[in-house]
Regions:
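Extracytoplasmic metal-acquisition and chelation regions
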Residues: 19-223
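Secretory targeting signatures
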Residues: 1-20
């Protein structure tokens, strides 16, 4: 009897160690994301509980990169799509959902501040925190297992701490800066204005650098 009990315990231990028993239907699933900030946040929150990849190859210009019909069909075979509904990502999300009515979706953009570029989503601490809140909440809504939910909550708290430290550092830098002017090629750094910086965009709406901008550059370089 003792030998049977020991054998049973060994089998159970082996199953648990090899991960053969899933705690939740959302564990071990295949998740696709769009832009890198969403991929990063999802990996920070869900870590090894799912296979997480982006629809965009790393290093490509997502403004110019176009997915093929075959790629969209392949991506539709995944279990969950997380995307930015404030961009053309929603077009891809619509196509993928049409190809697979059962795929779960999360729009991570709810409540985001106005963005001036895709870079603004990644660089702005307020936006990255909102992404994290949305993804955490939507993942928790899909998950039944309380332990997995708590794991995501703990990961969120660590990520929130990192974001808060970045926000504090930006405030400290702005406060201690004698020259608060920042020259940027585009509007991707415009969010820094809320910290007290003056952001000067080299490229205006007509794509030309005017004399006022040249004077600003000269003043900045001579400081």
């Amino acid at each position: 009897m003792k030998r049977k009990t020991l054998t049973f315990l060994l089998i159970i231990s082996t199953i648990l160690l090899t991960g053969c028993i899933k705690r939740d239907d959302m564990e071990g699933i295949d998740i696709i994301t769009t832009i890198y900030p969403i991929e990063y946040v999802t990996k920070r929150l869900y870590q090894d509980n799912a296979n997480i990849t982006s629809i965009y190859p790393h290093g490509v210009n997502i403004e110019e990169y176009k997915l093929t019909n075959k790629q969209l069909k392949d991506f539709s075979n995944n279990d969950l799509l997380i995307y930015n509904g404030n961009s053309n990502d929603r077009e891809y999300a619509t196509i993928i959902l049409e190809k697979n009515k059962n795929i779960k979706i999360i729009d991570a953009s709810y409540g985001l501040e106005e963005t001036y570029s895709k870079s603004d989503i990644w660089l702005n601490p307020s936006n990255i925190l909102m992404l994290a809140q949305n993804i955490k909440q939507e993942l928790s809504d899909y998950i039944d297992n309380p332990y997995l939910k708590q794991e995501i909550e703990n990961n969120y708290k660590l990520l929130k701490l990192d974001i808060s430290e970045l926000d504090t550092e930006l405030n400290r830098t702005a406060k201690n800066s004698t020259n608060k002017k920042i020259i940027s090629y585009d509007e991707s750094l415009k969010f820094l204005e809320k910290y007290g910086f003056e952001v000067i965009n080299l490229i205006s709406e007509n794509k030309e650098i005017d004399s006022n901008m040249l004077n600003c550059i000269d003043e900045f370089c001579c400081v």
